[in-house]
């Protein structure tokens, strides 16, 4: 059975506390945007509007190629960055999430991750101390209004 975009990671958090549903590469938003963009390009016959020096065939091949990017199952199921230090550490400690680590509050543990995600520690504390389904519903509500993720919740072009 084929998994629908977003459903593949809807209820999953990574070891690091990131909600996988918010990842536009893994949740299918980029693939869905590309699919719909291709439909619009074909429907409006944009190849007739393209400049003469534009290789429309290669452009369409690029769109088709992006649509073949597989959905990510999330790092808990073997997806994501295979060299992720956070995942490696959690697996070595046999933890379902870094939120259960007794070293979470130590400043040096998350320095590299905090450069990209300044609220990562707070997110980990959140997922440990709240009902995950409530948090997911809150995040989904927020995601519906954010680009490019909102494309996953639109049924029509």
Residue ranges and their predicted role:
Residues 1-157:
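Cysteine-centered metal-binding/redox modules
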């Amino acid at each position: 059975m084929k998994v629908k975009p977003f459903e593949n990671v809807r209820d999953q958090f990574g070891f690091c506390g990131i909600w996988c549903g918010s990842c536009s590469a893994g949740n299918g938003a980029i693939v869905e945007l590309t699919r719909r963009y291709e439909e619009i390009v074909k429907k409006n016959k944009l190849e007739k509007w393209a400049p003469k020096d534009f290789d429309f065939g290669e452009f369409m091949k690029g769109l088709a190629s992006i649509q073949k990017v597989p959905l990510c199952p999330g790092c808990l199921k073997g997806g994501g960055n295979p060299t992720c230090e956070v995942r490696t550490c959690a697996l070595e400690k046999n933890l379902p999430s870094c939120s259960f680590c007794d070293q979470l509050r130590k400043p040096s543990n998350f320095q590299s991750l905090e450069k990209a995600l300044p609220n990562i520690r707070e997110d980990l504390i959140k997922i440990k101390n709240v009902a995950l389904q409530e948090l997911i519903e809150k995040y989904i509500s927020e995601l519906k209004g954010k680009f490019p993720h909102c494309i996953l919740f639109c049924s029509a072009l």
